């Protein structure tokens, strides 16, 4: 029985290795297809970067996460300093200042800040779980620093990732779902203020009722909730005009109707959906997509790699990739549930949230169900910093698997 259980655990670990490496291999071919008419070798760099990432993951797999705890604040401080450096000496591209050039290689600190934030947030929540409303100030303080520095780059997509992983980790640590909903609700109010103003007549009283029923000092809590949402509704138009860059506003507007500017801001969305639709059931074949080969979609090898997948492998290929990500998330949930400590469990759930949020947002973007955000598709999109961070994440999760297995063996 023990031998069979051991074999099953060993086989499950191949989910965390096999799926990402398989996606990287396919992505190299897709990237090569997007650049066949140009003298680029990004497909080669994609595989080389993944190879470096695998080595890093193998090292981290053998390092117990508990040993990282003394270094979490310095790591977090270093990533924050790098985000500040982006503002001072960063490289600007495509209208945003997000990179630092080191030896001719562009490094994107915001990618590494995700991992640093997850690790420190996990340490804070495992030591100080949110049992009172005031306790939420600690995790908010941790996440707000990198969030703000990333938002002003500007990088709206990555800033959303920070918010998603914080809310999920708060819930996983034991925070009531009602409190999580109240934290998220001002963002919903902002969306309603811009799109469906009449919905606030129902939404704001509903949130006030939720605050009254779930928070201490019920009347004060509900009054403060109404004030916060009312202020958000008033401030949203100003934020729309002055808080977002012109191209960010265009992306949000054109998401609703790309045909308003088919040769400008809506071009990416329209061509992406055409490419995916042209793939049909089985696709044109790897390296055979006409829209992909002719480079109808600029920068397709980065944020829009899923459209190349759709054109060349069809619905079946897209479905297999989506199922692969679902299987990866299911395995991460299993690892988080069986982790030895709350800290390790929170790290895994934060990493899972980071990866799956990016998957959902990127795929929705490429099929026309979401605005263009600049969020890459994990293990598939070209991007050196993102690829290394993906494998760092994988290595941390594998470390939890390894330590859990050792604990299980010790109990035997």
Residues covered by each model-derived region:
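Hydrophobic alpha-helical transmembrane segments of multi-pass inner membrane proteins, especially
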Residues: 16-264, 311-368, 392-396, 412
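A juxtamembrane structural motif centered on a specific transmembrane helix
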Residues: 1, 362-412
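TM-adjacent membrane-interface loops and short helices in multi-pass inner/ER membrane proteins
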Residues: 254-302, 313-317
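Transmembrane helix boundary and interhelical junction motifs in multipass membrane proteins
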Residues: 155-160, 283-289, 300-302, 369, ...
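Hydrophobic alpha-helical transmembrane segments
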Residues: 126, 269-278, 390-397
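Helix-boundary and loop/linker segments of multi-pass membrane transporters
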Residues: 8-9, 135-136, 294-297, 339-340
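Short, Lys/Arg-rich, polar N-terminal cytosolic tail immediately upstream
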Residues: 1-10
